[in-house]
Amino acid sequence: MASQSQGIQQLLQAEKRAAEKVADARKRKARRLKQAKEEAQMEVEQYRREREHEFQSKQQAAMGSQGNLSAEVEQATRHQVQGMQSSQQRNRERVLAQLLGMVCDVRPQVHPNYRISA
């Protein structure tokens, strides 16, 4: 009976040690999963930062050249407007005199296609 009781005690202790080993293994597995998840998250963040930096540099390059083009177009437009204004100032009096002459100096004439029928 004592040997049977001692055998039961050994089995209980062995079962307890096995349960502890299983619990430790589960804890290690949970730690490994957590660590792997953190590493994967860090890799994703690093990749995202690299792609964002790449995008920003490409966008800056595209917008920078576009900004130069818009400045050139604006400067050309200003130059053309100034040319038109100076041309208008130079020719204003002559055009007004010509226009007034055409309106005020009326010379009545019979149209060449008009047929006098009598």
From Swiss-Prot:
Keywords: Cytoplasmic vesicle, Hydrogen ion transport, Ion transport, Membrane, Transport. Coiled coil: none annotated. Pfam families: V-ATPase_G (PF03179). Its main location: other. GO terms for cellular component: clathrin-coated vesicle membrane; melanosome; synaptic vesicle membrane; vacuolar proton-transporting V-type ATPase, V1 domain. It is a peripheral membrane protein. Residues 35-56 have a biased composition (Basic and acidic residues). The keyword Ion transport applies. Residues 25-90 are annotated as: Disordered. One of its GO terms (molecular function) is ATP hydrolysis activity. One of its GO terms (biological process) is synaptic vesicle lumen acidification. The keyword Transport applies. It is found in: Melanosome; Cytoplasmic vesicle, Clathrin-coated vesicle membrane. Residues 57-69, 78-89 have a biased composition (Polar residues). Subunit of the V1 complex of vacuolar(H+)-ATPase (V-ATPase), a multisubunit enzyme composed of a peripheral complex (V1) that hydrolyzes ATP and a membrane integral complex (V0) that translocates protons. V-ATPase is responsible for acidifying and maintaining the pH of intracellular compartments and in some cell types, is targeted to the plasma membrane, where it is responsible for acidifying the extracellular environment. Belongs to the V-ATPase G subunit family. V-ATPase is a heteromultimeric enzyme made up of two complexes: the ATP-hydrolytic V1 complex and the proton translocation V0 complex. The V1 complex consists of three catalytic AB heterodimers that form a heterohexamer, three peripheral stalks each consisting of EG heterodimers, one central rotor including subunits D and F, and the regulatory subunits C and H. The proton translocation complex V0 consists of the proton transport subunit a, a ring of proteolipid subunits c9c'', rotary subunit d, subunits e and f, and the accessory subunits ATP6AP1/Ac45 and ATP6AP2/PRR. This is V-type proton ATPase subunit G 2. It comes from Pan troglodytes (Chimpanzee).
